[in-house]
Amino acid sequence: MKTRKGIILAGGSGTRLYPVTMAVSKQLLPIYDKPMIYYPLSTLMLAGIRDILIISTPQDTPRFQQLLGDGSQWGLNLQYKVQPSPDGLAQAFIIGEEFIGGDDCALVLGDNIFYGHDLPKLMDTAVNRESGATVFAYHVNDPERYGVVEFDDNGTAISLEEKPQEPKSNYAVTGLYFYDNDVVEMAKNLKPSARGELEITDINRIYMDQGRLSVAMMGRGYAWLDTGTHQSLIEASNFIATIEERQGLKVSCPEEIAHRKGFIDAEQVKVLAEPLKKNAYGQYLLKMIKGY
């Protein structure tokens, strides 16, 4: 099986969240008990991806490095690259060309939170595809606010539209994408859109026109949370808090995922829990490894 590398795009200026984000990256803001970046990082970890590139702004990259380090504490290999200006999501593949090398890749947006019991299974199908691309569609009430995908009974995309006035479906394309290695050359050959950006929708459209774009449906029982407004930040935190308090289980806890995936052993979890043992997060980790 081919290696698949991951990219987290955590750039942007977060102007919609000013003044909150005037001095700190949006992706470092708390979503209940964790920094926002933990959630997309956990999504890639659940897909079994351990080589991950974090792309951010020149001013925020050192802060991500301070928080996450080289990833070895979780059995990961984290690298960092700067996106000098936000010139579109597809630019991630140009910035990450050297990191991706000859491998397939996955891209997740740093402000997208995914939740669902079968999410790892859904991603496994995308990971194991030999070629082509997979996007993840989520049913929304207001599709005109998103990139909208229409697909046939086999899950093959037949149309893609960006914020259409008359949507052909209620399925929005989420901020999680799996691509074969062809994506790098596609991104390098893209022309900027009318708003001057290299659009991810244009990449997806190329795959669709080639008949190589699969759509994985996030149906009932999944949550996709976008955190672009003050209100949605509160809603995301409340959602995570409700689940964690009700079940007594953490959502998107990198230490737990790394341990369950066999990236690290119980002894390493203990080391990571030690500085946190006075709070609920650290106590959760210590409780988790009891019996190991």
Curated annotation (Swiss-Prot):
Binds 1 Mg(2+) ion per subunit. Mg(2+) binds at D111, D226. It catalyses: dTTP + alpha-D-glucose 1-phosphate + H(+) = dTDP-alpha-D-glucose + diphosphate. InterPro entries: G1P_thy_trans_s (IPR005907), NTP_transferase_dom (IPR005835), Nucleotide-diphossugar_trans (IPR029044). Its EC number is 2.7.7.24. Pathway: Carbohydrate biosynthesis; dTDP-L-rhamnose biosynthesis; Bacterial outer membrane biogenesis; LPS O-antigen biosynthesis. Signal peptide: none annotated. It holds the Pfam family NTP_transferase. PANTHER family: GLUCOSE-1-PHOSPHATE THYMIDYLYLTRANSFERASE, GLUCOSE-1-PHOSPHATE THYMIDYLYLTRANSFERASE 1. It is an enzyme of class 2 (transferase). Its cofactor is Mg(2+). Homotetramer. GO terms for molecular function: glucose-1-phosphate thymidylyltransferase activity; metal ion binding. One of its GO terms (biological process) is dTDP-rhamnose biosynthetic process. Keywords: Lipopolysaccharide biosynthesis, Magnesium, Metal-binding, Nucleotidyltransferase, Transferase. It comes from the Bacteria. Catalyzes the formation of dTDP-glucose, from dTTP and glucose 1-phosphate, as well as its pyrophosphorolysis. This is Glucose-1-phosphate thymidylyltransferase 1. NCBIfam families: PRK15480.1, rmlA. It comes from Shigella flexneri. Belongs to the glucose-1-phosphate thymidylyltransferase family.
